Amino acid sequence: MRDPSSLYAGFPVGSQYESVEPPSLALLSSIYQEQVPAAPGHSYEQCAQPWPPLYREGGTWSPDRGSMHGLSPGTQEGSCTQAEGTKDSLGGDETLSRKSKKKNYHRYAKPPYSYLAMIALVIQNSPEKRLKLSQILKEVSTLFPFFKGDYMGWKDSIRHNLSSNDCFKKVLKDPGKPQAKGNFWTVDVSRIPLDAMKLQNTALTRGGSDYFVQDLAPYILHNYKYEHNVVVYAPHHMPSHASSLPLAEDPHQTNTGGKLNTSFMIDSLLNDLQDVDLPDVPRNIESQRISPAVAINNMWSSAPLLYPQSKPTRNGRGPGFSASHSTYSSSSSSISTISPVGFQETQERSEDLLGRQTQRLGFPTKRPREDDGCSTPSSDTDAGNYSPTEPPKKMPLLSLDLPTSYTKSVAPNVVAPPSVLPFFHFPRFTYYNYGPSPYMTPPYWGFPRPTNPGGDSPRGPQTSLDLDNMLKTVPPNKSVFDVLTSHPGDLVHPSFLGQCLGSSGSPYPSRQGLM
């Protein structure tokens, strides 16, 4: 660890520190004993390290002139190793000698500076302002004794910081061999974060130690000043107005760079939404500021109306409402889009949308609203000036339209059976070998018997399904598939068992066998 007369001493620029005798590490032992562990039986008075002062004649760590020639590695080697060798030669304890051999280096406290600052410090104080990797490692270990000894993990940290920070630039020794080793590294001081050059918050600095320079910027920048109208980390692809902001205007952007102007910012997203046609939202920005009372009362949204098949569907909110939104709203709760009728309606809506593209910028027009089969001109405008407390009127259900969530009367939920025959639990019998069971016959549900009822005798396999007759026998709110699979244990009605399985000579299995 360097003493107060070295780089760690925080003296102002221009001052001179005169020392008759270089202070030893004993002065620092009382401050941070845990950070600088002492070897047993040794005195730090005998291990004084002659560090050159900061502004002494021949010393080179000055902000005005950056040179490292005054710091020779020979003068910075401590005498602790020699003292240990002398004590061992004089017949010291064998246990102590074994411990000293096991730990053959003195572990100093880790310097409270970032690797970026230490690398930039040694590069900027070199004669040519550039160094190789081996030279950087040598100068850092010479300047900070923590990196001496058997600890080698800090070298990987040096390599990582050189390659990951964009302030360090590689200068090829031979441009024809970019992959060759031995290249030089320089530093761009304009891209160094200001916080990276300051004293870091470590356990050593939190202990109240004042023997470290608070800021290494004077020793790295060398009277270089940041331009206040240029952001330090402004990317090259950013617009000019973002990089021309003063650095001191926003305290949060002192070292993190300018504000990113991307498509994910809330301002850009709000600007994009202004050009989107939304339902019940006027395009004027000022008209979007609606009072809370009006917003609460306007709780009824306009529902899509049902129109006859011969007339195309029109938009209910004027040119500001998209026809595609109406198509989505009217078809989201039904399956009419997969039917031929729904396909024709969709095609007619698309043609009507193309015809209305030229009227989007024109004056608002009125449309006739069809209510209960009467086509009367409505007094409402395209902006939808209906009563906010009353729900919109709806068209009655037409025979050609499927029911939706907006219809007042819903037809029975009758659907066609699946194309594949449902699973039958009797593998010995086919689906049509015993004729229609009483469970599926009209008398069981109370319906009138069809004109041509099927006999109870077994039939042969049929080639197709008669959907009309099957749908007539289906009860309300039931489907063919529900009847066949909702109660697997009741597929065979008791009347069927009485008719077909009552006689002992019947070829079919008995009731106990089926159960």
From Swiss-Prot:
Motif (Fast/FoxH1 motif 2 (FM2)) on chain: 412-418
Residue segments, region Disordered: 55-103, 307-399
GO terms under cellular component: nucleus; transcription regulator complex
Tell where it localizes.
Answer: Nucleus
Swiss-Prot/TrEMBL keywords: Activator, Developmental protein, DNA-binding, Gastrulation, Nucleus, Transcription, Transcription regulation
Q: Report the superkingdom from the record.
A: Eukaryota
Record's InterPro entries? Activin_resp_transcr_regulator, FH_FOXH1, Fork_head_dom, TF_fork_head_CS_2, WH-like_DNA-bd_sf, WH_DNA-bd_sf
* Motif extent (SMAD-interaction motif (SIM)): 467-488
- Output the Gene Ontology terms for molecular function: DNA-binding transcription factor activity; RNA polymerase II-specific DNA-binding transcription factor binding; SMAD binding; transcription cis-regulatory region binding
**Keyword Nucleus in annotation:** yes
What processes in GO biological process is this protein linked to? Answer: activin receptor signaling pathway; cellular response to cytokine stimulus; gastrulation; positive regulation of transcription by RNA polymerase II
Composition bias type Polar residues, residue spans: 73-84, 375-388
Where is composition skewed (Low complexity) in this entry?
322-339
Its assembly, as annotated, is: ARF1 contains 2 smad2s, 1 smad4 and 1 foxh1/fast-1 protein. Interaction with smad4 is most likely indirect through interaction with the MH2 domain of smad2. Binds to the MH2 domain of smad3, which can incorporate into the ARF1 complex. The ARF1 and ARF2 complexes are activated by distinct TGF-beta family members; formation of ARF1 is promoted by activin. Interacts (via Fork-head domain) with gtf2ird1/wbscr11 (via repeats 4-5).
Outline what the protein does: Transcriptional activator. Recognizes and binds to the DNA sequence 5'-TGT[GT][GT]ATT-3'. Upon TGF-beta induction, forms a transcriptionally active complex with smad2 and smad4 called activin-responsive factor 1 (ARF1), which binds a site on the mix-B/mix.2 promoter called the activin response element (ARE). Binds to activated smads and the ARE with much lower affinity than fast3. Necessary for the first steps in mesoderm specification, directly inducing mesodermal genes. Acts with fast3 to control the convergent extension movements of gastrulation.
Q: What is this protein called?
A: Forkhead box protein H1
